[in-house]
Structures are given as C-alpha cells and as structure tokens.
Swiss-Prot record:
Keywords carried by this UniProt record: Transferase
Parts forming coiled coils: none
Disruption-associated phenotype: Impairs the production of terrequinone A.
Induction: Specifically expressed at both asexual stages. Expression is positively regulated by the secondary metabolism regulator laeA. Expression is also positively regulated by mpkB. Expression is also positively regulated by mtfA.
Its EC number(s): 2.5.1.-
Residues annotated to bind substrate: 81, 165, 167, 236, 238, 240, 330, 394
Catalytic reactions of this protein: didemethylasterriquinone D + dimethylallyl diphosphate = asterriquinone C1 + diphosphate
GO biological process, one term: secondary metabolite biosynthetic process
Superkingdom of this protein's organism: Eukaryota
Entries under InterPro entries matching the protein: Aro_prenylTrfase (IPR033964), Aro_prenylTrfase_DMATS (IPR017795)
Keyword Transferase: yes
Identification of the protein by name: Indole prenyltransferase tdiB
Entries under NCBIfam families matching the protein: arom_pren_DMATS
Length: 419
C-alpha cells in the first residue's frame, strides 16, 4: 500500500516534468517512470500518516520526503533530477537506530541497478557512519527534534541514462566523537580514494577559507557523483557550506572563497547572480530592489528562522585535477514569500532577465501551473544558480507536491550543526 501511494506521489510531479523538459523520448520517460515505481517508491518508508522518522528534505515544508527539481541551462535545455532522504526509525531504537545500515543496503542496491561506482561512497560511509559505541553516545546527545538523515539519495536523468548521487553529513559523527563538524569533513575528504591526491589543491582552498572566514560558514555535508573518477574526470565532490546570513556580501565572500577565486568565470558568476538577486529574495520595491545600488551588507529577515533551512546553502564543487572549483548557491525561496505563485513569478522573471528560453517564452510558469493546477499553494522551495564558461548560466528549480494527509506538513526544525 505504501509503495503504491509513493508511486502516485512521485509520478504526480515527475511524469509532467519529464514530458515538459523536451529532452526525453517517450521511451526514456516510460523507462525512468518504471524505474521510479519499482526502485524508488519502495524506499520512501511508511505511509506519511504512519510512524516514521522526521522528513528532512526541503519538501518537508509541504509534508513530503521527496525533492524533485528541474535543471535549466542558458540554452533552455532541461534535465529532471530528484533526491530523497533515507527515512530513519521514529524512535531511534533497535539495531539500526539511525538507519545507517538501511542506507548502506538501499544505496548499494541502487548502485548495482544502474551500474554506479561505489568507491567514494563506500569510503565515506566507513568514515562517517557510527560505530555501535558512537551510536549509543549519539542517542544520548541528539535531542529528539534534531533531524539528521543517515544519507540522501539522488538521481540525474540525462536522456536514457540515470546517474546515482550520494550525500552524507558529518554532524552525527562529529557530535558522537566530540569533533568539529567542518574539520571532521575536511579530514575525511583528504583520505578519499581513488584520485584523492588530485582533489587536494581545491580542498586546500576550502580549508584555508574556512580557517580565516569572517562569517560563520561551515561544512556539514558532502555529496558525490557515483562515477569512477579514473574514467569520469568530471566526477564531482560537492562540499556543502552553510551560512546563517543571507546578505549579498556574505554570498560574494563564500562564492569566491574570500577572494581566493578571482578568475573571470568566478567573478562573472557573482555579478550575474547579483543582477537577479532582488528577484530571488522577493525584494521588488524599495532600496534593495535595484541590484546596482543595493546595500550588500543587508540581511533579509526570514519567515521561518531557526530551521535547518535558514540562511543560505552553497556548494563548492571539486573534480580531480581541477585546482579551481566551481561554486553554486541555493536560495530558499520559501523564506522570502509564503506564496508559491509569487516565488514562481519571481523565478520566471529571473530566467527572463538571464535570457533563458523558459523565462522568455513563459514556459516555466506554464509548466508549474500544469503540474500544480489542483494545488492551492505548492512547495516552491529552492532555486540554485551557477555559471561556468562551458554551460553559461544554469539554474535549478526545486518544487514539491504537498501531502495533504500530513496536515499541511512542517519544515524540518533543526539539523544540529549550529548547536
């Protein structure tokens, strides 16, 4: 029954996204949806009104454990993606209180299905999952309201291909062992194999920045592409940074690693983002509405403070042999308006300003209105932004179908990394 429920929930968003993207043949769409029915729906846990560990994805804002998204490059080409958290037990009891054993089983099974490489994933699991003794310590130190998934699972869909992505936090291990969250993650990443030595120059930049930054940026999470880096030189290690402040001065500082990234691409990335910043934070009137003259030191008050999704998230994306990393920002649109319609309109205006076909033609809002036509206020959760010389500007829209059975849903309250 739960699998059938989750299959309907997943299809309600993903089927129209695949159709709208314009990059998937009918055969691709049918294959991907069948894969989702058979291998993703069974892993979303019990029915939402039955006992389960807290949902901690941004989609928990509307009661869902599942984060669908659509990535749109400057040419208008689009790719569908999604991620979900491995669901923990409701009461942290039993032999697998934090679902780390379950996460190992789920991820290795999915890796086998799609032919993914597990070398980096296996190393990170061994380094950051808890020993039995550490699990006992974590149970006493972690307050019940803290939601830290053991891992998150993601998939990118490129034509007929499916690429597995794996995400793992260092927060629980740091708490259980008394280590600093960022230092533990950096130490762990320095031992990554294979090709860990080729990641060191970019890792050194991140470590240097975190040791001298004037804001509170920290590194609680890492994500990887489950590809063999020896044959896929574009395999990424994505270092997720978080800041409490949402001022553009802090954004600029993080995206350039305190000025360490001063190449033309990094600087253009920041200035292009600045041109649409007022739209992303819903500042359409007043002094902060003009990107050219706005006060970069100003932080906008948030709707929902003290949540796991307050402030701003970033990724510093490193690949073997590349000394200069790419940087990306994730803006929580829901923090700046309680209306999905307003967030949707602002995001399309940003696409239009960036010259993206999905904005210029009105396609973005048309697709959203078709998917969520029966929903009064859906989850417009995040927008990500980056720029590279090869891709140009590329953005991702993260959306979520509400689960009404959850009574409206509530955003995950605390991930523990600021405690």
């Amino acid at each position: 029954m739960a699998t059938e429920y989750w299959s309907r929930h997943l299809r309600s968003v993903l089927a129209p996204l695949f159709a709208a993207a314009g990059t998937y043949s009918p055969e691709d769409q049918e294959s991907h949806l069948a894969f989702i029915d058979e291998h993703i729906a069974p892993n979303l846990g019990p029915l939402p009104w039955e006992p389960h560990g807290p949902y901690s994805t941004p989609s928990s804002l509307v009661g869902s454990p599942f984060d669908p998204s659509i990535n749109i490059v400057s040419s208008g080409k689009a790719k569908v993606r999604f991620d979900f958290d491995v669901i923990s037990p409701p009461d942290r009891t039993g032999p697998d209180p934090f679902a780390e054993g379950s996460a190992r089983e789920i991820l290795h099974r999915l890796a086998d299905l799609v032919g993914a490489d597990t070398q980096w994933m296996g190393y990170l699991m061994d380094a950051l999952y808890l020993t039995p003794a550490e699990a006992e310590v974590a149970k006493t130190k972690l307050p019940p309201g803290v939601a830290i998934p053991p891992s998150s699972v993601g998939f990118d869909f490129d034509g007929p291909e499916r690429t597995l992505k794996f995400y793992i936090p260092s927060v629980r291990k740091a708490l259980a062992t008394g280590q600093d969250v960022s230092e533990l993650m950096l130490k762990t990443l320095r031992g990554l194999q294979p090709l860990g030595s080729e990641l060191v120059p970019a890792m050194d930049l991140i470590a240097s920045y975190l040791s001298t930054r004037t804001n509170d940026a920290m590194l609680p999470l890492v994500g990887i592409d489950c590809l063999d880096p020896r044959t896929h030189k574009n395999a990424r290690v994505k270092c997720y940074l978080h800041t409490s402040s949402n001022s553009f001065a802090v954004v600029r500082d993080v995206l350039t690693l305190g000025g360490r990234l001063s190449d033309d691409t990094s600087l253009k990335r920041v200035e292009t983002l600045k041109s649409v910043w007022p739209l992303l934070i819903n500042e359409l009137e007043g002094p902060q509405s003009d990107a050219a003259t706005m006060d970069e030191s100003w932080s906008k008050p948030e709707r929902l403070n003290r949540t796991g999704y307050s402030g701003i998230q970033y990724t510093i994306e490193i690949t073997p042999g590349q000394a200069i990393p790419d940087t990306k920002i994730y803006v929580p649109l829901f923090q700046y308006t309680d209306s999905s319609e307003v967030a949707e309109r602002n995001f399309e205006s940003a696409l239009k300003k960036l010259g993206n076909e999905w904005g210029l033609s009105g396609k973005y809002r048309s697709v959203m209105q078709e998917i969520f036509k029966d929903v009064e206020n859906y989850g417009q959760t995040y927008a990500s932004f980056s720029y590279t010389e090869g891709k140009g500007v590329y953005t991702t829209s993260y959306v979520a179908m509400p689960i009404k059975d959850e009574g409206g849903g509530s955003l995950a309250g605390d991930f523990g990394f600021r405690n």
